[in-house]
Amino acid sequence: MYEYIKGTLTHIDGSYVVIESFGIGYAIMLSERFLVDLRAFMHQEVLIYVHSVIRETEHVLYGFSSRAERECFRLLISFSGIGPKTGLSILNMFPLQELCSIARLENVKAIASVPGIGKKTAEKLMVDLKQKLPTLMPLYLEEPVVPSSTANSSFKEGIGALMNLGFSRLAADRMMTEAVKELSEEASVAELLPIALRKS
């Protein structure tokens, strides 16, 4: 079983990416949301958390931007009637924080709007999600999927500020990385943020 795959992003297709690591190309299925974020990292080193689905005729890897997102996916596919594709569709429509909010408010209609999920399935899913999803939130506060070479406090503060504005952790990392390249690693967060926002 793989925990994560770290390597060079060499190919992006409609529903998957290829990560080359030690001469092996791994095809990894991703949500559309994650695919969009990864486009800025073409031919760069990335780290993707993975979940393996092994069947008689195929071995499929599903990729996620964080351990928390992967554990949420595993929780979703543990429910009867929800397979990997539907689980990925849920995460594509609702980031983990939003999914927690939906579960807390028991918004069955939101879950039922996901293709492949009916009202009855959504109602059953909501009961367990409300109880189990909050336990995953501590995992959400982990390092970005694409570690930056810049580790100064301004960089980290900038990422936090961008995430508070609604950007994903990966997008915030990309925007701040580009801002640092344009200025310098010694630049303050006040100097970096305006430039980072122009990179969105």
UniProtKB/Swiss-Prot annotation:
| Start and end residues of each stretch annotated as Flexible linker | 145-149
Q: Which residue spans adopt a coiled-coil conformation according to this UniProt entry?
A: none
Q: Where is this region: Domain I?
A: 1-65
User: Where in this protein does the record put region Domain III?
Assistant: 150-200
Q: Where located? A: Cytoplasm
User: InterPro entries recorded for this chain?
Assistant: DNA_helicase_Holl-junc_RuvA_I (IPR013849), Hlx-hairpin-Hlx_DNA-bd_motif (IPR003583), NA-bd_OB-fold (IPR012340), RuvA (IPR000085), RuvA_2-like (IPR010994), RuvA_C (IPR011114)
Its keywords, alphabetically, are:
Cytoplasm, DNA damage, DNA recombination, DNA repair, DNA-binding
The segment annotated Domain II runs over 66-144
Q: Which GO terms describe its biological process?
A: DNA recombination; DNA repair
GO molecular-function terms, A-Z: ATP binding; four-way junction DNA binding; four-way junction helicase activity
Q: Does the keyword Transmembrane apply?
A: no
List the Pfam families: HHH_5, RuvA_N
The record ties this protein, via SMART domains, to:
HhH1 (SM00278)
Q: A single GO CC term, please?
A: cytoplasm
Any notes on this protein's domains? Has three domains with a flexible linker between the domains II and III and assumes an 'L' shape. Domain III is highly mobile and contacts RuvB.
Q: What does the subunit comment say?
A: Homotetramer. Forms an RuvA(8)-RuvB(12)-Holliday junction (HJ) complex. HJ DNA is sandwiched between 2 RuvA tetramers; dsDNA enters through RuvA and exits via RuvB. An RuvB hexamer assembles on each DNA strand where it exits the tetramer. Each RuvB hexamer is contacted by two RuvA subunits (via domain III) on 2 adjacent RuvB subunits; this complex drives branch migration. In the full resolvosome a probable DNA-RuvA(4)-RuvB(12)-RuvC(2) complex forms which resolves the HJ.
The job of this chain, per UniProt, is described as: The RuvA-RuvB-RuvC complex processes Holliday junction (HJ) DNA during genetic recombination and DNA repair, while the RuvA-RuvB complex plays an important role in the rescue of blocked DNA replication forks via replication fork reversal (RFR). RuvA specifically binds to HJ cruciform DNA, conferring on it an open structure. The RuvB hexamer acts as an ATP-dependent pump, pulling dsDNA into and through the RuvAB complex. HJ branch migration allows RuvC to scan DNA until it finds its consensus sequence, where it cleaves and resolves the cruciform DNA.
* Family indicated by similarity: Belongs to the RuvA family.
Q: What protein name applies here?
A: Holliday junction branch migration complex subunit RuvA
Species of origin reads Chlamydia trachomatis serovar L2 (strain ATCC VR-902B / DSM 19102 / 434/Bu)
Gene name as annotated: ruvA
